[in-house]
Regions:
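Phosphate/pyrophosphate-binding catalytic cores of soluble transferases and nucleic-acid-acting enzymes
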Residues: 1-155
Length: 155
């Protein structure tokens, strides 16, 4: 984030009370909470993410339910959208309250992190996806066994 506005960051491990505290702070400051949780961005990922149900929210909760689980979503996409939300709040004279436990997501917003734009191709992944199609799961497992028997034993 640029130096023209302050932010509040409430971070910590799962079930440490971040959501409750961030809501209290945001309510007192009459602002919004911006989630920095890599799982809460996905629609339908309500179980296991401790996502505050819509009907229980006392302040706006941003960057939640903004991506489909079946679609590609990257930290760069999150960074762009979350920074835009934060700047809207700052421009309105409000202090964004970031809340969550995904350090990379928070760092991508508050630090000067740059990511390549567009889709990043993974030649290694592409190669092994092609091998999986050709050899099937068993054949791929056999290939793993020739390269790393100990890891193959674990699978």
């Amino acid at each position: 984030m640029s130096s023209h506005g302050s932010v509040i960051c409430i971070v910590g491990p799962t079930a440490s009370g971040k959501s409750s505290l961030s809501e209290l702070v945001a309510k007192k400051l009459e602002t919004s909470v911006i989630s920095v949780d890599a799982m809460q961005v996905y629609r339908g990922m309500d179980i296991g993410t401790a996502k505050t149900p819509v009907e229980e929210r006392e302040v706006p909760l941003l960057m939640v339910d903004c991506a489909n689980i079946s679609e590609e979503y990257s930290v760069q996409m999150f960074q762009t959208a979350a920074r835009a939300e934060a700047h809207k709040l700052i421009d309105a004279g409000k202090t964004p309250v970031f809340c969550g436990g995904t350090g990379l997501y928070l760092d991508s917003i508050v630090d000067q992190m740059e990511f390549p734009s567009g889709s990043v191709e993974s030649p290694v992944r592409t190669r092994y996806e092609k091998l999986a199609e050709e050899l099937g799961p068993e054949g791929l497992h056999e290939l793993l066994a020739t390269k790393d028997a100990a890891s193959a034993e674990l699978i």
